[in-house]
Amino acid sequence: MKKIYDLWVRVSLIKKIGIGVVIGVMLGILAPDLTGFSILGKLFVGGLKAIAPLLVFALVSQAISHQKKGKQTNMTLIIVLYLFGTFASALVAVLTAYLFPLTLVLNTPVNTELSPPQGVAEVFQSLLLKLVDNPINALATANYIGVLSWAIIFGLALKAASKETKHLIKTAAEVTSQIVVWIINLAPIGIMSLVFTTISENGVGILSDYAFLILVLVGTMLFVALVVNPLIAVLITRQNPYPLVLRCLRESGLTAFFTRSSAANIPVNMQLCQKIGLSKDTYSVSIPLGATINMGGAAITINVLTLAAVHTFGIPIDFLTALLLSVVAAVSACGASGVAGGSLLLIPVACSLFGISNDLAMQVVGVGFIVGVIQDSCETALNSSTDVLFTAIAENAFWKRKKA
């Protein structure tokens, strides 16, 4: 028994989730009457629902409070590229959702009533009101817009705090992240239960829907990595970007694909920047910063799954509302850094714009975890490789201006 336990501990989480998916499918086909097994999935999603608001608040406030004043480098352009790249990724995801509309199979209660917004004006009004919600109430009711706004305000206020206070905030963020890690480590069991419930209630044919969802997610990320990012690079450097793009994907993206953490890939990215010959004063700041705010892959995940939920519930959406969703997704994605599956936990932020309840949004998160074996790896690979790419092209443009 101990040997089995030791073997299980040594197996990576991504392999455990894969095993869980296979077992869940088999149980759903062979023993669909084990309805009590569904409670494990409900407990897993419940744990995520409980910790998600606190996670967003802790990470965002800690990140803002610890930001340092940049040296005389090209950090301004890098930050602009990070933010623009994340927004561009979110916008591409919206366009993809229009071209390839998805629907999800969710356990929607019969008496569920949705309150879809009537155009962008109502969405914007709702957004403003949520911004000023009581911070305690925002955490308790999972008002993620309010949580984000208060986290930013607290982070800015804490910039002037003592080192001891900042250390306490950092410790609180680390503790919250550790709790999330513990919950995420239960993902194989939770996902096994979620897959079992889905198969036992809807049949094997439901897997084709998830296959299409994976194809849309991965296809969108590949389009951003191989078309959008090179286009941005061409506009900045006026040079063929593909040798650099492919090197970043090969030497940074490949490692990030398996670690599934932008934060864990920081040393790899710094070593790559050194190999390329970039300034240490620049990349020592830009790479850790990119692991926090350069979240194009996360923005894609948030938008694709949110709009899939919108299509599932038949909620009408105009282009201006979709544009606002892109902005919200880009801002929300900044809170996903360094946490496995972090982008999935931020889907309720975007869902709340369309009157989708937190309970239903967390079901969408559950779907995200089922496809997360591939989605999270591809997302992290895109996020982390783009950190090096944008740092390199910004420095290239910086030295061109110096020579001119």
Swiss-Prot record:
Topology in the lipid bilayer: Multi-pass membrane protein
Transmembrane segments: 17-37, 39-59, 75-95, 138-158, 179-199, 212-232, 287-307, 313-333
GO cellular component, one term: plasma membrane
Intracellular or extracellular location(s): Cell membrane
Keywords: Amino-acid transport, Cell membrane, Membrane, Symport, Transmembrane, Transmembrane helix, Transport
GO molecular function: amino acid transmembrane transporter activity; symporter activity
InterPro entries: Na-dicarboxylate_symporter, Na:dicarbo_symporter_sf, Ser_Thr_transp_SstT
Pfam family membership, one: SDF
Record field: catalytic activity: L-serine(in) + Na(+)(in) = L-serine(out) + Na(+)(out); L-threonine(in) + Na(+)(in) = L-threonine(out) + Na(+)(out)
GO biological process, any: serine transport
Main location: membrane
PANTHER family recorded: PROTON/GLUTAMATE-ASPARTATE SYMPORTER, PROTON_GLUTAMATE-ASPARTATE SYMPORTER
Function: Involved in the import of serine and threonine into the cell, with the concomitant import of sodium (symport system).
Family to which the UniProt record says this protein belongs: Belongs to the dicarboxylate/amino acid:cation symporter (DAACS) (TC 2.A.23) family.
Name of this chain's protein: Serine/threonine transporter SstT
